[in-house]
Amino acid sequence: MGSSIGISKASDNVSLSSAIESGFVFDNKLIIEKKLSNFIELNCACYEGKNGLVVSQVERPISLSEILTFKDKYEGFKGGGEREFPAKIPTKTAEKVRQITKTVYERFGFFGIIRVDYLLYNGKIYLNEINTVPGSLAYYLFSDTLKGFSDILTEIIELSVQKFSSFSSRKFEYNSSVLDIKGVKGGKLKNN
């Protein structure tokens, strides 16, 4: 579902069994991963503007528990969780996160705003999740206010309209009889 809904941690077989049971309430497939301790969660966003890709500074969301929960993210102070922005991490690490975010955007051919979530563990950066429709459009990673973000949205919308008009002249279908079955008329076989 996203937003950490359905996420549980387990430290033994009993809690693992309970976590699996809880997870199946939300989906019919689960991912079970080794639990990491003492990691730092990082977020970085990107969008295509008129002058190329714009990559945000790196954010560190602050969790009140071992994992960043839905409550931490959306029900915290002032309607959102606590955060460190920009994240107090080594400059080299922040630049690497920003570069990976830019590469993800380019390689997947994204449109609009994305936010990429990372885990920093023992000095290594792990890509955790790509949010193609990030909560609040991740405006807080580009602007201090929603009013300031309106210029960014206007730019994204105008660029999207331009891109769409270039796609609208392309053909998205090709008519062919290659899949027609010989001898079939109106769904009934012909008698010879």
Regions found by a protein language model. Name each.
Residues 1-9, 19:
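Phosphate/diphosphate-binding glycine-rich loops and adjacent basic-rich segments that engage nucleotide
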Residues 11-84, 88-92, 120, 124-125:
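Phosphate-binding site of ATP-dependent enzymes
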Residues 2-3, 82-83, 136-140:
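Short small-residue beta-strand/loop micro-motif enriched in glycine and branched aliphatics
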